[in-house]
Amino acid sequence: MKLKVLETFVSVQGEGPYQGLPSYFVRCAGCNLNCAWCDTKELLKKPGRDVEVKELVKEAVKALSNGVHHITVTGGEPLLQQEGVNNFISQLLTEVGYTPIVIFTNGTIPLQKECDALWHYPDYVVDVKPPSARVRKPFVFPLTINYMTVHLKTVVTCEEDIYFVDSFIKTYLKNMKLSFIYYVNPTTQHIARKVFKEVLRWNKKYPLLEARMHLQAHKVWGLQ
């Protein structure tokens, strides 16, 4: 089985639950969105290359043996290739047993029931797209599955985006019975001050929600 891949590399994890830790990255080709401020827009124009899953597993195992903490599957949108990603995770688990794996997704692709490893093993960082992304796709990611570790994330560039996050929390998380971490990434100091006030309010109002101000640290450090 093959995955269509744009690149693989080792770098520091810039965001999410494993921020600051070394990771082996698999960047999948293809995306179903075209976000206005996408940071890989030029790269995503490329078709990618077909790579055997067993070769990716071999690279990942080598990286783990050389000090990498976890595996990151990103894009693009990796869930456009669910069968291949599921196969990659399954083969990797067979080789090394437990190792942390995180998948970055935009939350607009339904998980296929037959992809068992995708439901039971990886952590997810779900990038919830605000109005400033200028994309319209329904959010369909299953937030209520109690055996999945899901973290939410939104890049906030303006006040409209803050209102969007507030509305999303009310719509999807108001009656939640599971705890969630929601990373809110303000892009300017002005917006950051406003976001901080809302983070305080959200965390007070929703006991199972842990809203956090967040940033893409790899960009600050000048790393890939």
Feature roles, as predicted:
Residues 3-7, 34-122:
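Conserved Radical SAM active-site core
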Residues 25, 70-72, 125, 153:
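Short aromatic/hydrophobic contact patches that present stacked aromatics
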Residues 80-224:
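Conserved AdoMet/S-adenosylmethionine-binding subsite of the radical SAM
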Residues 17-19, 23, 33, 77-79, ...:
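Short, flexible micro-motifs
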Residues 13, 57-61, 170:
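Generic structural signal for well-ordered alpha-helical scaffold segments
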Residues 31-35, 63-66, 141-144, 176-177:
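Short amphipathic alpha-helical segments, especially helix-boundary/capping motifs
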Residues 2-37:
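N-terminal pre-triad scaffold of radical SAM enzymes
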